[in-house]
């Protein structure tokens, strides 16, 4: 099954305490951007990549693409919005070649082809599929610094990206969210409101999102453990 990819690279890096977009921070000699994008470029089923970036960084994205010898016909760069959701919507406007679209956060550099495989099976069966891992830690609900309850973690999952959807469903979900002025934290939260069942497939505990400075040493350790190749 072929798919198009909306690749989000318009982050600000504020929580990373970086002076630039965290996508351009180096991880073992290469930008996080390249680590996160390479598995999709290596997947022949990925027919098109829509990179959503800040307007002032388009030139830098193009330079990186040329270094990776990616055909221009396979890449399109679009301007991101003020919120993640608006950036995804901008990317979706440029989709339409394939029935299925994947959305991925560029700050997750350890995606694997195995996860992509599971997502494509999931979206074929359920029209919407996300990857996730079971919560390991004890979870508390806290109000004003005081524990209110211990949450049963049996049915709790930590959601990751990529997330996979049939394109018409994700577009419809974005249209509804815009109409109702709903702002979600991921695509699945929009699709759930249609309503539409969203299937879960197994992600990876290695598939972390690089958000704060503490994540960088962990990322280097993961890359070392994987031998530079993100396999489950």
Curated annotation (Swiss-Prot):
Keywords of this protein's UniProt record, alphabetized? Isoprene biosynthesis, Nucleotidyltransferase, Transferase
For this entry, the protein name equals 2-C-methyl-D-erythritol 4-phosphate cytidylyltransferase
InterPro entries per the record?
Answer: IspD, IspD/TarI, IspD/TarI_cytidylyltransf_bact, ISPD_synthase_CS, Nucleotide-diphossugar_trans
Looking up PROSITE patterns in the UniProt record yields: ISPD
Q: What class of enzyme is it?
A: transferase
Query: Which pathway, metabolic or otherwise, does it act in?
Result: Isoprenoid biosynthesis; isopentenyl diphosphate biosynthesis via DXP pathway; isopentenyl diphosphate from 1-deoxy-D-xylulose 5-phosphate: step 2/6
Q: What HAMAP family does the record tag this protein with?
A: IspD
What is catalyzed by this enzyme? 2-C-methyl-D-erythritol 4-phosphate + CTP + H(+) = 4-CDP-2-C-methyl-D-erythritol + diphosphate
Signal sequence, renumbered to the chain: none
Cysteine pairs forming cystine bridges in this chain are none
Which species is listed as the source? Listeria monocytogenes serotype 4b (strain F2365)
Which residue positions does UniProt flag as site: Transition state stabilizer?
15, 22
């Amino acid at each position: 099954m072929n798919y198009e990819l909306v690749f989000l690279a318009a982050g600000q890096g504020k929580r990373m305490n970086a002076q630039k977009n965290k996508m351009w921070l180096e991880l073992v000699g290469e930008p996080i951007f390249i680590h996160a994008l390479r598995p999709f470029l290596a997947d022949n089923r990925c027919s098109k990549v829509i990179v959503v970036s800040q307007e002032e960084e388009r030139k830098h994205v193009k330079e990186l693409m040329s270094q990776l010898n990616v055909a221009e016909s396979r890449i399109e760069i679009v301007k991101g919005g003020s919120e993640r959701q608006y950036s995804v919507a901008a990317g979706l406007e440029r989709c339409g070649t394939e029935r299925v679209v994947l959305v991925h956060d560029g700050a997750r550099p350890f995606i694997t082809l195995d996860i992509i495989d599971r997502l494509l099976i999931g979206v074929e069966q359920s029209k919407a599929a996300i990857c996730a891992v079971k919560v390991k830690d004890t979870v508390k609900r806290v109000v004003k610094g005081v524990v209110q309850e211990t949450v049963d973690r049996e049915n709790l999952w930590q959601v990751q990206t990529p997330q996979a959807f049939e394109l018409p469903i994700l577009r419809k979900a974005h249209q509804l969210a815009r109409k109702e002025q709903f702002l979600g934290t991921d695509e699945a939260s929009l699709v759930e409101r249609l309503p539409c069942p969203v299937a879960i497939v197994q992600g990876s505990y290695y598939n972390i999102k690089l958000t704060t400075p503490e994540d960088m040493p962990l990322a280097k350790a993961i890359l070392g453990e994987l031998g530079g190749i993100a396999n489950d």
